[in-house]
Amino acid sequence: MMDQARSAFSNLFGGEPLSYTRFSLARQVDGDNSHVEMKLAADEEENADSNMKASVRKPKRFNGRLCFATIAVVIFFLIGFMIGYLGYCKRVEQKEECVRLAEAEEADKSENDETEYVPKSSRLFWADLKTLLSEKLNSIEFTDIIKQLSQNTYTPREAGSQKDENLAYYIENLFHDFKFSKVWRDEHYVKIQVKNSVSQNLVTINSGSNIDPVEAPEGYVAFSKAGEVTGKLVHANFGTKKDFEELNYSVNGSLVIVRAGKITFAEKVANAQSFNAIGVLIYMDRNTFPVVEADLQFFGHAHLGTGDPYTPGFPSFNHTQFPPSQSSGLPSIPVQTISRAAAEKLFKNMEGNCPPSWNIDSSCKLELSQNQNVKLTVNNVLKETRILNIFGVIKGYEEPDRYIVVGAQRDAWGPGVAKSSVGTGLLLKLAQVFSDMISKDGFRPSRSIIFASWTAGDYGAVGATEWLEGYLSSLHLKAFTYINLDKVVLGTSNFKVSASPLLYTLMGKIMQDVKHPIDGKYLYRDSNWISKIEELSLDNAAFPFLAYSGIPAVSFCFCEDEDYPYLGTKLDTYEILIQKVPQLNQMVRTAAEVAGQFIIKLTHDIELTLDYEMYNSKLLSFMKDLNQFKADIKDMGLSLQWLYSARGDYFRATSRLTTDFHNAEKTNRFVMREINDRIMKVEYHFLSPYVSPRESPFRHIFWGSGSHTLSALVENLRLRQKNITAFNETLFRNQLALATWTIQGVANALSGDIWNIDNEF
């Protein structure tokens, strides 16, 4: 049977019988090492008794083996060619057949999903992208969209109102028109405070049985305590803590009148409350706010925090089933805004000239006359309302799960042109520009760009904070920067910046690239500009991103030395803004260029350009402050040695990370992603892990608020020097230990893997 099979098989190759061969690699006697001899099994059987070696092949057998070899070579060649071709097609940029294959694949996808972009073959670099961005922005008339948003169709648009929702839907439709990767809305049910539609708020002067009405204000302060209080009235300048400490009279049991400006309404009220005041009146004085209209009404809020104060630390989703609670930042005293005319009427019944150091007009007086009291009645009511945040995303091409967020407040009490229309208009135009750059010009961001329209910003960044609270556990792992576009143009003279230290260096480089539209000089004018950076305030939507979520944030504006006087008033109109800033279009265009360069730089570069080394100087400054109290610390039997060690570990970790970056293979996306992830952790790890986000939402040890902050630690030591009996040593010991371990934790996170951490702390 085997012989028949062999015979049949051999007939395929010329009819010659095939047999197994045996190769002998034995060294020959003559020394020739290259000779290979073959023995045919059939020949061996015929010559079993002889030692004769068969070395001659028949021609036809040779042809059969040659055919085998040729086929094998061809097959291996084809396999190698296909592997090489496919590998090459993946590595090179889209060319020739690869381009056609990729375009065909993308064309199929676009039929099913209109939001997908068709890749282009061009490759743009930083210089190309800057030029492209500038050209795109030059062709836009920003004032057109600002005027459109200022029409009666969309104003006034208090949070949750029908006009606010109308604008939300308009923005949502535009995002769809821009062909974003995805557009969605975020819905929350929040409690805000509004004026009572039946009972007015009222300020009166009571003198015995006489009641003299001062004003029934149209404006109000949201989240004020509702109720009535009566007492002596005293002036406390701007209502800062220092102002209260320097007063020559007590405010205990009295109402306080303070000027608007310098700090937020909420901080003024909290300070007054801490000095046992029973109520607060806020007005705009002539020097700080040189407005013509003495009876101008204005609006604000008194929540010392952000977000919905009735769901502190957790999101206001409709299905949330937490028991009723409220933020500790809500005031326990009534607060009301009054016009300048009402304030001057009160001053006529007061005595004592205000100090010259206050730099205030002569009408200002200090204390209400004897036998007179002021009565404040606040009838504000809570209202539950639905709010909508609108989002659109351009997904990154390399790391779509890493994103920058660009946002602007949409709502406003009154017309809100400078407060929200400028920022919203800028947001929409930036979204359109980046959509065009990707779909038409070949821009390929490595990371994603999220455009966000927030509402309820007038009540303390409620929309933005609720979104952050809803995704607290994951956002810091994904979002690496927030850019705030609120109030970007309030003047022309100054360019002011508030930001995380991680963004200082990048902002400086952008300022060296962008020119002021009026004088033509670069925005970078002073090598010491970092010292002029202002901290993010509570009423800035970027604040909760930084202090609550640990996401680096930046906010900037073109403005004057004085505050813009019409924010939060019925005169925040397009006509007045264009009167104050005739070059509005150029100023908004420049603000767009600053924001646009931020977006490009942070989504285009392989390295995440966050300067983690900037916190070295912040830590050093903190250590210098502590050194003033070395003797006090020693008296308590404590040492700063471990704090020095933690700061040193942070310095070494930043140096090691910089070295790792310089030594890294920049084309290796996996290596660069690991380095970028370490950089992303820096800001988040400055949030104290030892306090609850519900009890102390702003956990950042540099920019937050509470006993866990570094500033609170220093203040506690100052208190020891002033009044040792009021000093709490146990609290200080906890503050010192937890601050040390928080800083050490940041150093450990920067170091990378656990085996790279110096454990000799």
Swiss-Prot record:
GO cellular component, one term: membrane
Motif annotated as Endocytosis signal, chain positions: 20-23
Protein name: Transferrin receptor protein 1
Described purpose of this protein according to its UniProt entry: Cellular uptake of iron occurs via receptor-mediated endocytosis of ligand-occupied transferrin receptor into specialized endosomes. Endosomal acidification leads to iron release. The apotransferrin-receptor complex is then recycled to the cell surface with a return to neutral pH and the concomitant loss of affinity of apotransferrin for its receptor. Transferrin receptor is necessary for development of erythrocytes and the nervous system. Positively regulates T and B cell proliferation through iron uptake.
Organism in which the protein naturally occurs: Rattus norvegicus (Rat)
Gene3D superfamilies listed in its UniProt record: 3.50.30.30, Transferrin receptor-like, dimerisation domain, Zn peptidases
PTM per Swiss-Prot/TrEMBL: Stearoylated by ZDHHC6 which inhibits TFRC-mediated activation of the JNK pathway and promotes mitochondrial fragmentation. Stearoylation does not affect iron uptake. N- and O-glycosylated, phosphorylated and palmitoylated.
PA domain sequence ranges: 229-346
Position of sequence motif Cell attachment site: 647-649
Residue ranges of the region described as Ligand-binding: 570-761
Highest taxon of the lineage: Eukaryota
